[in-house]
């Protein structure tokens, strides 16, 4: 065994955690940041890499970013158009009509081309991608990669490799990735 891949580990309100509540906090049921560092350190000592699942196409309805249920102390996009996260989401009729992953209302879809979102996930010094690599992860598996814009994937890959030159980036693509057409464009995964 040379690589350990984890399904989503970030705080969420479901058991599957594909409805991310906070990208910068490990779900308390799984441990804490200190546990994560120790696990990555021990894995590296044994010649293994740790790959995290990056769910960057959508967040949770009950998240610090959307906050439809008000469980977070931050002002989410569902609560106010003044939320720092409002531009991340595509509201058709705020607050109750918004784009969601495959029509599942508890998974509000994000606009991956939004500058604020890209900064938070990819570019900022403490961005999600860079932060977890710095804490010991070796790479990312991108959930529904065929639903992420090529430009987003390219920026994510570049930022990850700036942080860790041997960072591993894997994308979930259900069809033949060598000639995948998605949203009327040939994808450039390779």
List the model feature ranges, each with a label:
Residues 33-52:
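C-terminal EAL-domain catalytic cores of bacterial cyclic di-GMP phosphodiesterases
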Residues 9, 54-55, 173-174:
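Short strand-turn motif at the edge of the Rossmann-like AdoMet-binding core
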